[in-house]
UniProtKB/Swiss-Prot annotation:
Record HAMAP family: RNApol_bact_RpoC2
A GO molecular-function annotation: DNA-directed RNA polymerase activity
Assembly behavior: In plastids the minimal PEP RNA polymerase catalytic core is composed of four subunits: alpha, beta, beta', and beta''. When a (nuclear-encoded) sigma factor is associated with the core the holoenzyme is formed, which can initiate transcription.
This protein's UniProt keywords: Chloroplast, DNA-directed RNA polymerase, Metal-binding, Nucleotidyltransferase, Plastid, Transcription, Transferase, Zinc
PANTHER family referenced in this protein's UniProt entry, alphabetically: DNA-DIRECTED RNA POLYMERASE SUBUNIT BETA
Binding site for Zn(2+): C224, C295, C302, C305
InterPro entries: DNA-dir_RpoC2_beta_pp, RNA_pol_beta''_euk, RNA_pol_Rpb1_3_sf, RNA_pol_Rpb1_4, RNA_pol_Rpb1_5, Rpb1_funnel_sf
Protein name: DNA-directed RNA polymerase subunit beta''
Length: 1397
């Protein structure tokens, strides 16, 4: 006893969990050391101990044992945040649908996988004896994936078609599912319940086919004598140690293993765990092992090539049916895994790429010539490295070098600052042999009706040249311009022309906007701008139907008129400012008193940019002359008429100018207020005509009166006018002189009226005679406005001082004029103000009498000046010479070929290309006479446009004059082709004035055929991006600024604005500076100005100086190779197919969906798509190698190499599927199956052999031997058969007939006269004969036969001593030895082959 205690004291105590793998290893070691009998005794004790412990522990599973992982909440939130950002990018058109789906799947897969990995550590720390933890992680019941569904999250699922549902199930089964999640889960449940039976039968059928193909493979001899093997190396690190050990265990060495001069192991020695550990420890040379692939026996296998038996750990015995064992070993896990089904929705990509992270903070540098820009598979901008790239990260005192391997994506820009552990590159995992891929088509459908536009060239696919299917050559946007198409079956006769106004109530428009004019508000008016119906209707001379006025849609170049002020019986279209740009100037500082209306100064410029003498330059709306509501203006009295010569406002060629005319001199303006409601004809009115009402009386269902007084109701054809007059009523009986007056205005302070002292502001007397009643007089209050003369007004108080600086020969005068005619009623609605008096700034200049012709007009243009990084805007007014001088200069051959002003010509430069210093600006100012004023006036805090009147400044743009005066007959010389332009000098000749943008009448541009490349060369400024944006944001602007009109009857209209408008807020916009041009497409998240709202995506259809009108459009991003359905400008309806993506998708290796994947490998169906180039390369290589080595050796080597490579690849693929499910299958079993799949070659038609006919399948060994025997080449190529086809191409027709197609196989065999030698197991079972296998096989062989065999073995060895390893260089020796070889081995095979054929 003491001895026993002492021995126990010396034993090592292991306190570790023994799982299934550890238990397997322990039993192997026990068998090696103690043998079978002793090991079984030990295992009985272990079993008894296990049952005893399980009974005493009595583990049971309750719902309280399911503890959710604490980190789940923030992990899911993080994934949701990423998904939200992704959705935004998709909406903006930065990523397309496939990239979104792919990224969404990976986000949720990574989250789910991380949660799964968290389970074990979480349980180990918080509750190590949790029953769920003990059961699942010991392998006793369930696996990690099932527990993950209980306490982690269910994750992504697949729909019945096997497609991913990108909405993940975030809950786990412990928390319970929401209704949506439950419905998504139902797909998986159906798979689990219904498919289990189907899948079990699938797994059973797979097992049957596997057994069928290898049932005749039996261990027949000890050693086949092969010298070939497969080499494995523990050094290269490509193979994990676990896989390396598993591959080596139980194998037999094909060669001696040396470390230096010491022999570690010898040939034909079987490998145990001790030898494997020594190999790993000593890092031995590549180890060559024997496998079933290298066995020389055709129909069976030898002991050494098979290795150890999996049952007892010794070399396999003779007569063992290893083929059937292999088939069942592979088929059985499929059955087992089907029964414990688990669904991840087909996401077993494991394809989260490896990342390279920055070692420290610092600035990154790399050689930009070695990379080129691309998109990652998630749609992010990146750089692709074609070769190894060395990246340097400079921190304060240290340089880090990082090597980026080839074909990786670099996710940062050069000179970008990166933080420690930031992902800087993504290493592309070689997925060619890893994953199963399939090509999937994804159709994208239109979300709305609209018109299709492309922003880049699209090629016709060759097979659809006359159809509407197109292929995209490069990444670009596809735009659907929203609009309501007319779906009427009848084609209506249309008189509409482009850009016409249209009534929105017209029947060809699908939707309507109805609103009551008396309650018009700003949101209603905003609807018109956001409305995407730009219809067309013939212009009316008069609009009498006021209720439709709010539906006038703004298109083309008409400024929008808001119907706040209606002039009775006036033509609305003539009042519209068709030919003006309005530039409102607003103060930076908000007014302190919010209630005071802000006074607005607007600069008014004609659209053709030309001022004539006495033109209005700016106007000022004085808030004192602003009035809310309706009323009647009066500025003449019955007693006082003084006629004075005064200037009147007239229209002349679209330009407002003052001309002398006789008109009443007005010093006071009277306004008689009244409340007016214009109602639809169908309105129900709750007050009577000619009645008196009080304040806040109900007039209609939703209108109340604002004032009290006398009601007058007038019913007209299409509307009702309801007027309320406030005031006092006087009947004629009263002793009042007022009653004598009728419809007269009595001004205040009239000396001969005693009663007028009561009325401080004067009164308006109106006589009213109701039907059959006495008349009475209504005395209405009057508001008086004093109008000061324009000469006495101080300009500085009204206009910004910057407009009134010292100027060269430019005069400015102030003129007041009244906006309304005398006695004309004003109809104001919805609390909007009516401006009664406007103060104008009239522009004039000194005209030299000698050169009067040359200064009739002044030309306005915008100038942009950039100084010290600040961009400033100016308005420049140049005096223009007469057109005759231009034509003369243009046609003068001695001239420069270009119209010029003071010889400087017109020039252009990119405003971003140069930044001027103060010194240079001063220097330029000395050269160019004229004044430039700074943008900010520090005293007043105003910001405004400046007027530069330097007549000798260089002027922009030939379009104003060349086209204007040569429109009819003279052909236009296009800028792009003009040889006289000194392009190199463009940047230097303009000085500090930057680019001047001419304001021209763009109607005349319609006949230009090509674009002016010089003027449209500034697209996007990227200087500030590097400083302000750490996040890379690429916006795809439109590449094609042309406008195509889809109407076939009209001409194609090119970009009418051949320049680009820059929009800046008054403070310099650092974020971005896009250029807005007409017809351009804008993505939604592009910022136009700082603090400005982000625009919705769309196409610019109207550019004004301070605003842009955008037609809503939806962008769809498409990558190269995408198919586009439909033509440019085609009208599409909701639900139509827009584009089709073709992309590769990693298919699931999950066994429930993945069992078919294993089957596909065994059946050798096409899994990965092979490129055409690769196939051509292989064919070329085959031709070359046969030419170099000669016919017999070319075919032999080509077929051998192909077969060896495909065998290894197939084994790896099958193992990967099973390992992903945690199933361990020894490589030997798979190798036996794959050997049978790849054992045949196909006789080719290149050469007619005497023995085989073309297209015949023969064994590779047989083809080699027959070629040697006949001394002529047999032309053949390698072929992969698949298990079903291999089962139907064996040496036994009885075996084939019992598998499939019985009648066909038997009929064919009878016609050919085939003989079945009954070598295999199945044939003998069918015929009821003795089975030719079993481990008692060696006892049946007589000793004499055994002796003969041994003598033959020695003879064979002597004959093969001359056989060399390398068939490339020693083929003569090999050929001679093969010819002199004993025929014993081949006779039987040849005989069988001849009978087969």
């Amino acid at each position: 006893m003491e001895v026993l205690m002492a021995e126990r004291a010396n034993l090592v105590f292991h306190n570790k969990v023994i799982d299934g793998t550890a238990m397997k290893r322990l039993i192997n070691r026990l068998i090696e050391h103690f043998g079978m009998a002793y090991t079984s005794h030990i295992l009985d004790q272990v079993k008894a101990l296990g049952f005893h412990q399980a009974t005493t522990t009595s583990i049971s599973l309750g719902i309280d044992d399911l503890l959710t992982i604490p980190s789940k909440r923030w992990l899911v939130q993080d994934a949701e945040q990423q998904s939200l950002v992704l959705e935004k990018h998709h909406h903006y058109g930065n990523v397309h649908a496939v990239e979104k789906l792919r990224q969404s799947v990976e986000i949720w897969y990574a989250t789910s996988e991380y949660l799964r990995q968290e389970m074990n550590p979480n349980f180990r720390m918080t509750d190590p004896f949790n029953p769920v933890h003990i059961m699942s992680f010991s392998g006793a019941r369930g696996n990690a994936s099932q527990v993950h569904q209980l306490i982690g999250m269910r994750g992504l699922m697949s729909d019945p078609q096997g497609q991913m549902i990108d909405l993940p199930i975030q809950s786990n089964l412990r928390e319970g599912l929401s209704l949506t999640e439950y419905i998504i889960s139902c797909y998986g449940a159906r798979k689990g319940v219904v498919d289990t039976a189907v899948r079990t039968s699938d797994a059973g059928y797979l097992t049957r086919r596997l057994v069928e193909v290898v049932q005749h493979i039996v261990v027949r001899r000890t050693d086949c004598g092969t010298i070939r093997g497969i080499s494995l190396s523990p050094r290269n690190g490509m193979m994990p140690e676990r896989v390396f050990i598993q591959t080596l265990m139980g194998r037999v060495l094909a060669d001696d293993i040396y470390i230096g001069t010491r022999c570690l192991a010898t040939r034909n020695q079987d490998i145990g765990i001790g030898l494997v550990n020594r190999f790993i420890t000593f890092r031995a040379q590549p180890i060559s092992i024997r496998t079933p692939f290298t066995c020389r026996s055709a129909s069976w296998i030898c002991r050494f090539c098979y290795g150890r038996s999996p049952t007892h750990g010794d070399l396999v015995e003779l007569g063992e049916a290893v083929g059937i064992i292999a088939g069942q070993s592979i088929g059985e896990p499929g059955t087992q895994l089907t029964l414990r089904t688990f669904h991840t929705g087909g996401v077993f990509t494991g394809g989260t790429a490896e990342h390279v992270r920055a070692p420290s903070n610092g600035k990154i540098k790399f050689n930009e010539d070695l990379v080129h820009p691309t998109r990652t598979r998630h749609g992010h901008p990146a750089f692709l490295c074609s070769i190894d790239l060395y990246v340097t990260i400079e921190s304060e005192d240290i340089l880090h070098n990082v090597n980026i391997p080839p074909k990786s994506f670099l996710l940062v820009q050069n000179d970008q600052y990166v933080e420690s552990e930031q992902v800087i590159a993504e290493i592309c995992v070689g997925t060619s042999t890893l994953n199963f891929k399939e090509k999937v088509r994804k159709h994208i459908f239109s979300d709305s009706d609209g018109e299709m536009h492309w922003s880049t060239d699209v090629y016709h696919a060759p097979e659809f040249t006359y159809g509407n299917v197109h292929l995209l050559p490069k990444t670009s946007h596809l735009w659907i311009l929203l609009g309501g198409p007319c779906r009427s079956s009848r084609v209506s006769l249309s008189f509409h022309k482009d850009q016409d106004q249209m009534n929105a109530h017209s029947p060809s428009i699908k939707r309507r906007y109805t609103s009551n004019l008396s309650e018009t508000n700003d949101p209603e008016r905003q609807k018109l701008f956001s409305s995407y119906f730009y219809g067309k209707k013939k212009k009316k001379n008069r609009i009498s139907d006021y209720s439709n006025l709010n539906q006038i849609l703004c298109t083309g170049h008409c400024n929008f008129i808001s119907p706040t002020t209606l002039h009775q019986n006036s033509d609305l279209f003539s009042k519209r400012r068709k030919n003006k740009f309005l530039i409102p100037l607003q103060s930076i500082q908000e007014p302190e008193n919010k209630l005071m209306p802000r006074s607005s100064i607007s600069i008014e410029i004609p659209q053709n940019g030309t001022f004539r003498g006495n033109s209005i330059l700016a106007y000022f709306d004085d808030p004192r002359y602003r009035r809310k509501g309706s009323g009647i203006p009066q500025y003449g009295t019955i007693e006082m008429h003084s006629i004075v010569k005064k200037e009147d406002l007239v229209e002349y060629r679209g330009v407002k100018a003052f001309r002398p005319k006789y008109q009443m001199k007005v010093d006071r303006l009277f306004f008689i207020p009244e409340e007016v409601h214009i109602l639809p004809r169908s309105s129900s009115i709750m007050v009577r005509n000619n009645s008196l009402i009080g304040v806040d009386t109900q007039l209609t269902l939703n209108i109340r009166s604002r004032v009290g007084g006398f009601v007058r109701v007038e019913r007209k054809k299409k509307r009702i006018e309801l007027k309320i007059f406030s005031g006092d009523i006087h009947f004629p009986g009263e002793t009042n002189k007022i009653s004598r007056h009728s419809d007269v205005l009595i001004p205040p302070g009239k000396p001969n009226s005693k009663e007028s002292k009561k009325w401080k502001n004067g009164i308006y007397v109106q006589r009213i005679t109701p039907r059959k009643k006495k008349f009475f007089v209504l005395v209405r209050p009057v508001i008086t406005y004093e109008i000061t003369d324009g000469i006495n007004i101080n300009l500085a108080t009204l206009f910004p001082p910057d407009l009134l600086q010292e100027r060269d020969n430019v005069q400015l005068r102030v003129v007041n004029y009244i906006l309304y005619e005398n006695g004309n009623p004003i109809r104001g609605f919805s609390h909007t103000d009516s401006q009664l008096v406007r103060t104008c700034l009239v522009l004039n200049w000194d005209q030299d009498k000698k050169k009067s012709a040359s200064s009739e007009e002044a030309r306005a243009s915008f100038v942009e000046i950039r100084t010290n990084g600040l961009i400033r805007h100016f308005l420049r007014i140049d005096l223009v010479k007469s057109p005759i001088s231009y034509i003369g200069k243009r046609n003068d051959p001695s001239g420069s070929g270009l119209p010029s002003d003071n010889g400087s010509g017109w020039t252009n430069m990119n405003p971003f290309s140069s930044i001027y210093s103060k010194a240079r600006i001063q220097q330029s100012l000395n050269q160019n006479q004229g004044t430039i004023h700074t943008l900010l006036n520090r005293n007043t805090g105003f910001q405004s446009l400046r007027i530069l009147s330097s007549s000798n400044c260089s002027r922009m743009g030939p379009f104003n004059d060349v086209i204007k005066y040569h429109k009819e007959s003279i052909p236009i010389t296009l800028i792009t082709k003009d040889p006289f332009i000194p392009i190199k000098n463009f940047k230097n000749s303009l000085g500090p004035f930057g680019t001047a943008f001419p304001i021209a009448n763009f109607d005349s541009f319609s006949h230009l055929i090509t674009q002016n490349r010089i003027l449209v060369n500034n697209y996007l400024e990227l200087d500030n991006f590097k400083q302000t944006f750490q996040v890379i944001q690429y916006y795809l602007m439109d590449e094609n600024p042309k406008i195509y009109n889809p109407d076939l009857g009209s001409n194609i209209l090119l970009n009418p604005f051949n320049w680009n408008w820059y929009f800046y807020h008054h403070t310099y916009c650092q974020e971005t500076s896009p250029i807005i041009s007409l017809g351009q497409f804008i993505c939604e998240n592009v910022c136009i100005a700082k603090n400005a709202p982000h625009l919705k995506s769309g196409q610019v259809i109207l550019v004004q100086v301070a605003s842009v009108v955008i037609r809503s459009a939806k962008p769809y991003l498409a990558t190269p190779g995408t198919t586009v359905h439909g033509h440019y400008g085609e009208i599409l309806y909701e639900g139509d197919t827009l584009i089709t993506f073709l992309y590769e998708k990693s298919r699931s290796s999950d066994i429930t969906q993945g069992l078919p994947k294993v089957e596909e490998v065994f059946e050798v169906r096409s899994i990965d798509s092979i490129s055409m180039n690769l196939e051509k390369r292989f064919k070329g290589w085959n031709k070359r190698i046969t030419r170099i080595l000669g016919m017999p050796w070319g075919f032999l080597i080509g077929a051998e190499l192909t077969i060896v490579q495909s065998r290894i690849s197939l084994v790896n693929k099958i193992q990967r599927v099973y390992r992903s499910q945690g199933v361990q299958i020894h490589n030997r079993h798979i190798e036996i199956i794959v050997r049978q799949i790849t054992s045949k070659v196909l006789v080719s038609e290149d050469g007619m052999s005497n023995v085989f006919s073309p297209g015949e399948l023969i064994g590779l060994l047989r083809a080699e031997r027959m070629g040697r025997a006949l001394e002529e080449a047999v032309y053949y190529r390698a072929i992969l058969l698949g298990i079903t086809r291999a089962s139907l191409n064996t040496q036994s027709f009885i075996s084939e007939a019992s598998f499939q197609e019985t009648a066909r196989v038997l009929a064919k065999a009878a016609l050919r006269g085939r003989i079945d030698w009954l070598k295999g197991l199945k044939e003998n079972v069918v015929l009821g004969g003795m089975i030719p296998l079993g481990t008692g096989f060696k006892g049946l062989v007589p000793p004499s036969k055994q002796d003969n065999n041994s003598s033959l073995e020695t003879k064979k060895k002597n004959l093969f001593e001359g056989e060399m390893r390398d068939i490339f260089f020693h083929h003569r020796k090999l050929f001679d030895s093969c010819r002199s070889k004993n025929f014993h081995d081949t006779s039987e095979q040849s005989l069988l082959g001849f009978h087969d054929s």
